[in-house]
């Protein structure tokens, strides 16, 4: 995986937008940067505006786009792994780390603008539960190891079927 996007150079190219359209099956909305890339250079995660062009608030700052990563997170969700992960994030020191991940997510989003409707709301159920593995995996890929404990755990659980350091595009 290519490290998190250079925040001083958040440009999204036309080629990126073409790949995103292919990955998502629709035009990408609110993209302000590519937050993580596959080793081949294609987007894995995009950074999105907290308010879409139509005025809608959009709390998912880090949106997972890689179809293979999305499928992996979906498989984990379908097998009920969020229940055990929610129990896990209620134990120390994981609870404190998950709270810091929540705060990090909010700080990253605040760099993009203030949207009162979603103030204090991060993504994926943070800071007290696990609701969406896609959002948590996207955050982990964008922020790097050690920031989001659940996203890091999802990466570990996917390692036999999907890894960001191996191209499966």
Predicted segments — roles?
Residues 2-169:
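Preference for intrinsically disordered or flexible, low-complexity segments
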């Amino acid at each position: 995986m290519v490290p998190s996007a250079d925040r001083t150079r958040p440009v999204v190219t036309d080629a990126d937008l073409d790949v995103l359209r292919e990955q998502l099956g629709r035009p990408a909305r609110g993209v302000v940067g590519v937050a993580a890339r596959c080793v081949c250079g294609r987007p894995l995660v995009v950074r999105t505006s907290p308010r879409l062009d139509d005025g809608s608030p959009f709390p998912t700052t880090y949106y997972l786009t890689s179809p293979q990563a999305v499928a992996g997170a979906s498989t984990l969700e379908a097998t009920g792994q969020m229940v055990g992960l929610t129990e896990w994030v209620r134990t120390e020191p994981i609870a404190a780390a998950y709270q810091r991940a929540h705060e990090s997510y909010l700080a990253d989003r605040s760099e993009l603008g203030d949207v009162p409707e979603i103030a204090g709301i991060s993504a994926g159920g943070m800071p007290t539960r696990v609701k969406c593995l896609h959002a948590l995996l996207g955050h982990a890929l964008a922020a790097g190891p050690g920031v989001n404990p659940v996203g890091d755990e999802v990466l570990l659980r996917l390692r036999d079927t999907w890894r960001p350091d191996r191209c499966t595009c």
